[in-house]
C-alpha cells in the first residue's frame, strides 16, 4: 500500500480506471456538487477533497495497466464531469488548444500506435452510457460529445451523471471566462494536491485497509466486494449479455428488487462488538455452511478475500451454482430472520420465532448458520425441522441455566452443520443437577427470558386460554427484595423445611442467597413504585394508597397462579421455604419444556 497527496493529474499515468461493472450507481447530489465547487473556487486556500483507493489489477501481457476503484467513485466521477463542463464552456479555439491536455486525463489508448481513444474511467452498468454521453469521444484530436443531451433536456428526473453535468455547466456559465480558465488550470496544476491517492497492490486486503484508514468508521461493504468478484469472474467466463441477465435474475431481484429489499439488506444489526448489515451476515452464514469460513481461524475482514480466492478458481457451472445458492439462502434468511421490537407478539407454537427470540435475548447470533442450514435442508419436512430447532433451543437454555460458557459456540456451530446429532449429545451432557444449581442464583436477564417462555408454555397447554400471544415487555420483580434488611428483618429466616435458623450470620447468608433464586422472581406488567419494592410481602401484594401492588400488575399466570392465588388461599408469608418450593416447581417445568 502506498499513500500520497496528488492532484487530479495523476490520471495521466493511469490506463484503464475501472469502477466495478455491477457497482452501485453514482449518487452525489446538488449539496455535494455545491460543496466541491465552492471549495475549488477559493483559489487562495488549500483544499482536501478526500481520498481515492485504487487497486492494481493483474497485468495482462501487452495491455496497458488497469486499476480498480475501491473507494472514491463519487469524487473521481464528479471531478471528471467538472473538467468536461469547463471544457465545453470554452470557445472553439480554446477547446482546440486544451484538447490535447485534457485527453490525457479523460482518455487512454491501449497502444501508443493506436488512433482510437477509450474513456479512461469505465463506469458501472448503471451509469456507463450516461458517463459516455458526458465525456464523449476523441475525433480528429478534439473531444466531441455527439450524444450529450442539451442542457434544457436534462431535468431532476434524469440520471445523476447528467444532473451533475447540468449543475456544473449552468453554475460555471454564470461565471466570467477568466474564472473558468483559472479553475481549469488550477485543477490541472500538478502542485494542486487536492486528494490523497492510496494505491493498493494486487495482494492487499482492501477491506482491512479501508477499515484502518477510514476514521469516520464508514465500512467498505464486504457484500460489494464479493458481488464484484462474482460478476467479474462471470465476465471472464460468459458473454456480457449473459452476465447482465444472470445479475438481474439472481442478484438484483434478490437484493435490490424494490425499496423494501434495499432497506432490509442494508439494515445493520449488532453481532458481538460489530454492526453489520443483513447482506454481510448472510454471506458469512453461507461461508460457514460451505466450510469456506472458520470463525476460529478467520477474521471478518478476511471474508471477502476468502470468497474472492475461491471464486477465482470457479468454472462457469460452479459460479452459477454459488450465485444460485446465495439467492436461495437469501430468500430463506429474509423469510425467517425476524426483527423484534416492543410491539412484537410471541407465541409458544411459533417454534422458529421462539428460537430466534431466545437467541436474540441472550445476545447469541453464532448459531444462525446452523439454523439457516436446517431451514434449507428441511424446507419440505417441518416435523424434522421442528425437532432439530428444539434440540438447539434446549441446548442453549440448558447451558444458560447451568451457567456454561458460550465461547465455544463458534466451533459447535461448525460441528453441528457437519453432524446434527451432536446437538442432542451436547444438550444431554448438561445434567439436571447443574440446572438445579444454576437457577438458585440466576441473573435478572436470564430469569426474564425463562419465565416469559414458561408463561407462554402454560398458555399454550391450556385449551381454555384464549390469549396465546404476548409482548416481551414485562418487568422482573424480586418478591423478597434485594434490600430486605429494613422491612423484612422481623420475618424469621427458615431453612428449606420451614425450620427457623437461629444463628444470625447463617440466617443472613441464607436470606441473601435466596433473593437471587428463580423461585423468588416473577414478571409484572409494570414496575412497582420504588418506595413499595422493599416493603413487606402484604404491602407489596396489595399496594398502598394510590401505589399499586403486585395484585394490580399480575396479568401473567406465572404471577397470578404462583403468587396471588397462593396468597389468597391464606399463605400470606413469603420466606425461604416458599422460595425453595417455587424454585423446585419451576425447575420441573423447565425440564419438561426443555427436555433433551
What feature does the model see in each segment?
Residues 175-181, 188-193, 349-358, 434-438, ...:
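Active-site-adjacent structural elements in folded domains
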Residues 7-14, 45-63, 177-187, 200, ...:
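Active-site-adjacent bridging/hinge elements
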Amino acid at each position: 500500500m502506498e499513500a500520497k497527496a496528488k492532484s487530479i493529474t495523476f490520471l495521466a499515468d493511469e490506463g484503464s480506471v475501472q469502477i466495478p461493472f455491477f457497482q452501485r450507481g453514482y449518487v452525489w447530489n446538488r449539496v455535494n456538487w455545491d460543496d466541491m465547487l465552492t471549495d475549488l473556487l477559493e483559489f487562495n486556500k488549500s483544499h482536501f477533497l478526500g481520498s481515492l483507493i485504487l487497486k492494481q489489477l493483474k497485468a495482462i501481457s501487452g495491455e496497458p495497466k488497469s486499476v480498480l476503484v475501491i473507494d472514491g467513485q463519487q469524487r473521481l466521477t464528479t471531478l471528471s464531469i467538472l473538467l468536461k463542463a469547463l471544457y465545453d464552456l470554452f470557445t472553439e479555439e480554446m477547446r482546440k488548444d486544451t484538447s490535447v491536455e485534457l485527453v490525457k486525463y479523460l482518455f487512454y489508448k491501449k497502444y501508443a500506435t493506436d488512433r482510437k481513444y477509450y474513456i479512461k474511467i469505465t463506469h458501472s452498468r448503471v451509469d456507463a452510457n450516461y458517463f459516455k454521453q458526458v465525456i464523449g469521444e476523441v475525433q480528429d484530436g478534439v473531444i466531441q460529445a455527439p450524444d450529450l443531451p442539451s442542457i434544457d433536456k436534462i431535468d431532476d428526473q434524469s440520471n445523476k451523471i447528467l444532473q451533475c453535468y447540468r449543475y456544473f455547466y449552468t453554475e460555471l456559465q454564470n461565471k466570467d471566462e477568466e474564472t473558468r480558465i483559472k479553475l481549469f488550470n488550477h485543477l490541472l496544476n500538478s502542485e494542486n494536491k487536492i486528494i490523497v491517492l492510496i494505491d493498493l497492490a494486487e495482494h492487499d486486503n482492501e477491506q482491512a485497509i479501508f477499515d484502518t484508514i477510514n476514521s469516520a468508521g464508514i465500512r467498505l461493504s464486504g457484500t460489494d466486494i464479493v458481488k464484484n468478484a462474482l460478476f467479474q469472474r462471470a465476465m471472464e467466463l460468459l458473454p456480457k449479455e449473459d452476465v447482465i441477465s444472470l445479475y438481474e435474475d439472481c442478484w438484483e431481484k434478490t437484493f435490490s428488487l424494490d425499496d423494501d429489499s434495499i432497506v432490509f439488506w442494508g439494515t445493520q444489526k449488532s453481532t458481538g462488538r460489530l454492526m453489520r448489515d443483513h447482506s454481510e451476515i448472510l454471506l458469512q452464514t453461507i461461508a460457514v455452511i460451505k466450510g469456506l469460513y472458520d470463525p476460529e481461524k478467520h477474521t471478518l475482514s478476511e471474508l471477502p478475500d476468502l470468497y474472492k480466492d475461491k471464486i477465482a478458481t470457479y468454472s462457469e457451472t460452479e459460479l452459477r451454482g454459488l450465485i444460485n445458492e446465495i439467492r436461495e439462502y437469501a430468500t430463506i434468511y429474509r423469510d425467517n430472520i425476524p426483527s423484534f421490537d416492543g410491539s412484537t407478539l410471541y407465541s409458544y407454537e411459533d417454534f422458529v420465532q421462539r428460537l430466534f427470540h431466545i437467541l436474540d435475548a441472550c445476545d447469541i447470533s453464532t448459531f444462525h448458520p446452523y439454523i439457516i442450514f436446517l431451514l434449507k435442508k428441511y424446507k419440505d419436512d417441518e416435523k424434522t425441522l421442528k425437532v432439530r430447532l428444539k434440540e438447539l433451543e434446549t441446548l442453549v437454555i440448558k447451558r444458560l441455566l447451568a451457567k456454561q460458557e458460550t465461547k465455544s459456540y463458534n466451533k459447535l456451530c461448525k460441528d453441528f452443520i457437519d453432524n446434527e446429532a451432536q446437538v442432542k449429545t451436547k444438550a444431554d451432557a448438561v445434567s439436571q443437577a447443574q440446572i438445579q444449581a444454576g437457577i438458585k442464583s440466576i441473573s435478572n436477564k436470564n430469569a426474564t427470558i425463562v419465565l416469559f417462555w414458561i408463561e407462554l408454555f402454560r398458555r399454550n397447554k391450556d385449551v381454555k386460554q384464549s390469549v396465546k400471544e404476548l409482548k416481551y415487555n414485562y418487568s422482573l420483580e424480586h418478591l423478597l427484595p434485594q434490600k430486605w434488611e429494613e422491612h423484612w428483618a422481623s420475618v424469621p429466616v427458615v431453612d428449606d423445611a420451614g425450620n427457623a435458623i437461629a444463628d444470625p450470620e447463617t440466617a443472613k447468608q441464607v436470606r441473601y442467597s435466596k433473593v437471587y433464586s428463580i423461585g423468588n422472581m416473577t414478571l409484572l406488567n409494570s414496575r412497582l413504585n420504588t418506595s413499595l419494592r422493599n416493603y413487606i410481602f402484604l404491602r407489596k401484594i396489595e399496594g398502598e394508597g394510590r401505589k399499586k401492588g403486585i395484585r394490580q400488575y399480575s396479568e401473567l399466570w406465572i404471577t397470578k397462579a404462583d403468587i396471588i392465588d397462593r396468597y389468597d388461599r391464606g399463605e400470606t408469608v413469603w420466606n425461604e421455604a416458599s422460595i425453595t418450593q417455587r424454585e423446585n416447581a419451576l425447575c420441573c417445568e423447565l425440564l419438561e419444556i426443555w427436555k433433551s
